[in-house]
From Swiss-Prot:
Role this protein plays: Component of the type IV secretion system VirB/VirD4 which could be a major virulence determinant for subversion of human endothelial cell (HEC) function. Altogether with VirB4, may be implicated in providing the energy, via hydrolysis of ATP, for the assembly of secretion system and substrate transport.
Family: Belongs to the GSP E family.
Database matches in InterPro entries: AAA+_ATPase (IPR003593), P-loop_NTPase (IPR027417), T2SS/T4SS_dom (IPR001482), T4SS_GSP_E_ATPase (IPR050921), VirB11 (IPR014155)
The organism of origin for this protein: Bartonella quintana (strain Toulouse)
CDD domains per record: VirB11-like_ATPase
GO molecular function, one term: ATP hydrolysis activity
Gene Ontology terms: cellular component: plasma membrane; type IV secretion system complex
Gene designation: virB11
Domain of life: Bacteria
Protein name: Type IV secretion system protein VirB11
Reported effect, T195P: In strain: ATCC VR-358 / Fuller / CIP 107027
């Protein structure tokens, strides 16, 4: 039985790879970040040198629809007029987003393929590549007041604040992960959020039990004691479970940390529940334009969620400021991943907690 299932799985992968043959060269090209198809007979790629357009005579509308259906079958999902949007992971771990009519213009199909990094970089390696070369400190409390107010902080916060004030961001983030600070990585799509989150996750001590919650497998957890939980995006997939159900399950699985892959829609509310349940040390991502704007984005996401709709906006924002210790803003600058801002303000949190 197991051999039959293994054979069936291999056959399914072979069918997908055969269908993807017209773009296989782009999938194998390690210099590319993104592969997009906006319409039949054309492929666009993004690499270090920017966007390029390539004619693709083999990619007719029917051929693209064939790819969409095979990918849907491979990922145990459906794509049709009634379900025109598909999020999936290809056999090579590339993330693919497919949109077909009527959700896009007639006779067109949109495919966006995000290629995973060919290797995982350590925080130190990223720093040596200039990750923090343009980084600015962001806080509600004036930075000039930090040194004079160190005596207000506990020992670990004193050490963190010292590294932060000295712009020793590698030491700062290393300490932050080890002492289970809640870290939010913000930026737009393709800004390097996942690359940085992998580097930070690698800093979690090996003796901690980690539960990850994702809609597509992307996070790399090198620690031996971890469980990767997957929820069905938009109710697709074999199991109709969402982040709420997985979080409730994770809380019963003896976790030291629960890591949500990305905060959007209802997941932002469950992020608050996770932190508030006594499981700090979260490392997660959100789409936002600046570090402080991440608070506003999170407030909107929580407010729009089913669980947070009745909460007042100011209460949500205050709760987020009290719970999120660090926000790291990522951006791609001239084709290179950069951290442009780091928010850290223990004094603001201390005021919210009443000086405790």
């Amino acid at each position: 039985m197991n051999q039959n299932l293994h054979k069936l799985s291999n056959e399914t992968v072979a069918i997908v790879l055969t269908k993807l043959e017209p773009i296989s060269a782009f999938l194998k090209d390690k210099s590319l970040f993104e592969i997009v198809i906006n319409r039949p007979y054309q492929v666009m790629t993004e690499g270090i040198e920017g966007w390029k357009t390539i004619e693709a005579p083999a990619l007719s509308f029917d051929e693209l629809m064939g790819i969409a259906k095979v990918v849907a079958s491979y990922s145990k999902q459906k794509i049709s007029d009634k379900n025109p949007i598909l999020s999936a992971t290809l056999p090579g771990n590339e993330r693919i987003q497919i949109v077909i009519p009527p959700a896009v213009e007639k006779d067109t199909i949109s495919m966006t393929i995000r290629k995973p990094s060919s290797r995982n970089f350590s925080l130190e390696e990223l720093a040596n590549k200039g990750l923090f070369s343009v980084c600015e400190q962001v806080s509600f409390t004036p930075l000039n007041d930090y040194q004079s107010r160190f005596s207000e902080l506990k020992h670990i916060e004193h050490s963190l604040a010292t590294a932060y004030s000295n712009k020793d961001f590698v030491s700062f983030l290393n300490q932050a992960v080890k002492c289970q600070k809640n870290i939010l990585i913000a930026g737009k799509t393709g800004s390097g959020k996942t690359t940085l989150s992998k580097a930070l996750i690698a800093k979690i001590p090996d003796n901690e039990r980690i539960i990850t919650i994702e809609d597509t497998p992307e996070l790399v957890v090198p620690q031996p004691n971890y469980v990767s939980m997957i929820y069905s995006k938009d109710g697709q997939g074999l199991a109709s479970v969402g982040p709420k159900e997985l979080l409730e399950s994770a809380l019963r699985m003896r976790p030291d940390r629960i890591l949500l892959q990305e905060l959007r829609d209802g997941t932002a509310f469950y992020y608050i529940r996770n932190i508030n349940s006594g499981h700090p040390g979260s490392i997660t991502t959100v789409h936002a334009s600046t570090a402080l704007a991440a608070f506003e984005q999170m407030t909107l996401l929580v407010k729009e969620s089913e669980g947070g709709g009745d909460l007042e906006r100011d209460d949500i924002r205050g709760l987020l400021i009290s719970m999120i210790d660090i926000i790291v803003q990522c951006k791609r600058v001239e084709g290179k991943f950069k951290v442009t801002e780091i928010y850290y303000d223990p004094f603001k949190q201390r005021n919210i907690f009443g000086g405790n």
